[in-house]
Amino acid sequence: QMIQAMLADMAQQTEAARWLTYACAAKADAGAKNVTKIAAMAKCFATDVAVKVATDAVQVFGGYGFMEDYPIAKYYRDAKILQIYEGTNQVQRIVIARNLIKEASQHDHYNSVIPDEFQDSFGAAKVTANV
């Protein structure tokens, strides 16, 4: 039953990553002015899911998951490199955070939501959030 639960989780995560990617593509196709944040989210989430699913697949296959006779080991290596290509996931997270800060700073209630002691930090982040 545990393997069934892992397979279900793997399918759910893969489907969620797929739909986030579709949402990004749909925004771009519709001519959205800025898809930077959702593109970074899609890349980061989908590649994290790919590594998690590949890792779980290695676990499901047990010792065979590490053997080169089976494709699982290659899938894991391929998934891992996806987190590095076209900007590491850490860089993608910075892009996402800067866009979130930029969006938050454009709202009137920005100053009322950010405590005074953090205003300088967020103000500095706001200036560098021009992505």
Regions found by a protein language model. Give the residues of each.
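Alpha-helical interface subdomain recognition
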Residues: 1-131
